[in-house]
Amino acid sequence: MKKIIIFVVLVLGAVYFFSNKYFYKPPVLRIGSECDYIPNSWEENFQSDSNIPVTNHKDYYAEGYDIQIANLVAKELGMTPSVVKLKWEDLIEALLRREIDVIFSSMLDTEERKRLIDFSIPYELKKTEYAVMVRKDGKFADIKKLEDLYQARILSQKGTYFEDAIEQIPGAVKATPVITVSDMIEELDNGKVDGIVIDVDTGTTYEKMDDDLKLITFPEGEGFIVGFSGVCAGVRKNDRRLLERIDTAISKITPRMRQRVMDQVISKVWHNNPNP
């Protein structure tokens, strides 16, 4: 009888061990992202060794700086990353409705947003700076300061800090905001506006992709004044433990690692030529 009991215990132990080792599925981290903001996030219709499936867009995969930072965070947390593509203006609402667990979408921790959700420490490569993008053949192609954009028709993305930034351009005409950065670029390309407000990193990427566009940056103290810490991950206010774990994971991503991620992402932009 004793031998039978020992045998049963050994069998049960073996079953438990192998079931955990071979059948354990780590929890999923549902990442909300706009997937329309090269080089930070976009989607592509092929799988690679680095992109992440978009759960609500069949046969599409998310890629970009935001996505790869989120991937590193998920791995540090022992979770499987999955991306949910959302319109920019729907990201916070989806988070509050628990449709996603975290936002990784180049979101800035503005005071208005901090009243709704909590933010991680910044994960950007360098401090976010704003610039103006114009057409090379346009009448504002040679401006040197914000004041030179007097009476220029300037466009922004709806629901972003780009909208507020236009208010800092004396005498500028504020065009009706559009939904995505791609929409901004299209409006500018088609000559419907004189310029757009965009962050330097994204603007630099689009400038290299479109020979008709020119990115204009401003010396420190002469450009846009921004009221935020930087690009951060967003979580619900009651998810304090998750926020602490995300902060710890982000803190382990060194500046050199962040630069390597960005370099790899930029390389993929040129080689894969995604169509955002």
Question: What spans do the regions from the language model cover?
Answer:
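N-terminal Sec-pathway targeting helices
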Residues: 1-12
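Ligand-binding clefts/hinges and TM-proximal coupling segments of bilobed small-molecule sensing domains
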Residues: 17-18, 161-178, 214-219, 247-276
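Extracytoplasmic small-molecule ligand-binding "clamshell" domains
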Residues: 24-107, 115, 174-177
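Periplasmic-binding protein-like
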Residues: 35-36, 124-136, 207-250, 268-276
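Bilobed "Venus flytrap"/periplasmic-binding protein-like clamshell domains
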Residues: 35-38, 59-76, 131-183, 200-201, ...
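Acidic, polar ligand-binding/catalytic clefts
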Residues: 67, 71, 75, 80-148, ...
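Short amphipathic alpha-helical coupling segments at ligand-binding clamshell hinges
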Residues: 69, 145, 199, 237-252, ...
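Short, hydrophobic alpha-helical packing/hinge segments within bilobed ligand-binding/sensory domains
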Residues: 69-70, 90-94, 100, 183-187, ...
